[in-house]
A protein has these predicted regions:
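Juxtamembrane intracellular "pre-TM" segments in multi-pass secondary transporters
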Residues: 1-13, 189-221, 395-402
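Loop-to-transmembrane helix entry/capping segments in MFS-fold secondary transporters
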Residues: 45-46, 131-141, 326-336
């Protein structure tokens, strides 16, 4: 599948995207409104930030224990239920005079409910698309996410200039209801991909199974570590250039859009499997110039070029799917989303600590150097695994999957 026309003719792909766009728009508009509401109520930038990103942290905890449900529950029902739960929770958040403790209790519940969302959506996308259409379809999904974030934050900011935060939260709740409706009417009722009941023990057993394969381990590390270290650099835009942080983030979004479009649409599969390492190096190398503390214009160019390298995620996700049984696709993608969120959080914390001890520019450079080092190390390990798998005779662990070659 090499054309957008063929992609959008795929049954259910368009309603899948529309439901996701409505959900993402609700998240951005609602998150900005809630952060503003908490800041006005408490005067605390910390509580405001946690109110916006707290559900993601709770989602990380929930996915650690509940991820087996991504393949053991019917996807349409789960996605509709998640959207309805967010609509109800966001409506509660809009209630006047709601105590801050109650706000964070609702956010915790929302995060736990959403812990299945990434795995269920990823597995459903894998079901909807053919194998040769996954990268193109995922690239459009990623581009839509970036565009929706930019439009959602811009729209949310404009709405907050005209309306009070509770009114914006009610608008977000309506968008969640729209996402649930589109999911219910536009998607087919599929059975679970895997038999059995979701449980904590099943989650841990499947996590262990996915991690037991060395090619999959290398693929997961390639998805998480270089990306997380560079996101640490990204987190320092505000302290590096307070007056131009928005410009740098916009340039990063532009680079991601270009990279996803190019890799998903223009790069043939025979080439795609060989460019994971070059793309991961591209993701980090331009940040090395920050050691010279470049002006905003040059910084914007470096950020734009570097962000094209985020398209490595498409290549590595395609590899992950080739290494994973279809009945574990949702769990495997959910584990990827969980690990990536964790490593990005670690990267941001590490970068902030380095910036406190040195300077934002030095910290960004060090994080980029760490990303380059991790990419080179993983490439060497991948080559060793490729040679080991190609050697005659039995291999330790009895792996039958292809090696994680770069």
């Amino acid at each position: 599948m090499r054309s957008y026309r063929t992609l959008f003719r795929t049954p259910e792909y368009t309603p899948f995207l529309l439901s996701f766009a409505a959900f993402a728009a609700a998240q951005t508009i609602g998150g900005l409104a809630l952060g503003t509401l908490v800041l006005r109520a408490t005067g605390s930038p910390l509580l405001s930030a946690v109110s916006m990103f707290g559900p993601q942290l709770a989602q990380l905890a929930g996915a650690t224990f509940l991820l087996s449900g991504a393949d053991r529950l019917p996807p349409r029902a789960i996605l509709s239920g998640i959207a309805l739960a967010f609509a109800a929770g966001t409506t509660v958040l809009a209630l006047p005079g709601l105590p801050v403790r109650a706000v964070f209790a609702v956010l915790l519940l929302q995060g736990l409910v959403a812990s299945l969302g990434g795995g269920v959506r990823g597995g459903l996308l894998n079901d909807i698309l053919t194998k040769d259409g996954y990268v193109l379809g995922r690239s459009v999904y990623n581009m839509l996410w970036g565009l929706t974030q930019m439009a959602g934050f811009a729209t949310g900011g404009a709405l907050l200039a005209l309306l009070p935060p509770p009114a914006c939260l009610l608008l977000a709740a309506a968008l969640y209801l729209l996402a649930a409706l589109v999911t219910r009417l536009g998607l087919t009722a599929r059975p679970p991909r895997s038999a059995g009941r979701p449980s904590i023990s099943a989650t841990w057993r499947t996590n262990a199974l996915l991690w037991s394969s060395r090619p999959r381990r290398l693929t997961y590390l390639g998805l998480w570590v270089p990306n997380g270290l560079v996101v640490g650099s990204d987190s320092l835009y505000v302290s590096y250039a307070p007056g131009a942080a928005g410009t740098l983030y916009a340039c990063g979004a532009l680079g991601m859009f270009v990279g996803d479009m190019a890799v998903g649409r223009l790069v043939p599969p025979s080439v795609r499997r060989r460019i994971a390492t070059p793309l991961r190096l591209l993701l980090a190398v331009p940040y090395l110039c920050f050691v010279l503390r470049p002006a905003v214009a040059l910084s914007a160019v470096a950020v734009t070029v570097a962000s094209v390298g985020f398209a490595a995620g498409l290549v590595l996700q395609e590899r992950l799917m080739s290494l994973t049984p279809d009945d574990l696709a949702g769990h495997a993608l959910g584990l990827h989303a969980t690990g990536m969120a964790a490593l990005q959080g670690v990267g941001a914390a590490l970068a902030g600590t380095l910036a406190q001890l040195t300077s934002p520019a030095t910290a960004m450079t060090l994080m980029a150097a760490g990303s380059v080092t991790s990419t080179v190390s993983l490439a060497v390990l991948g080559r060793q695994e490729e040679r080991r798998s190609a050697a005659p005779g039995p291999h330790p662990g009895g792996l039958s999957e292809p090696a994680a070659a770069d």
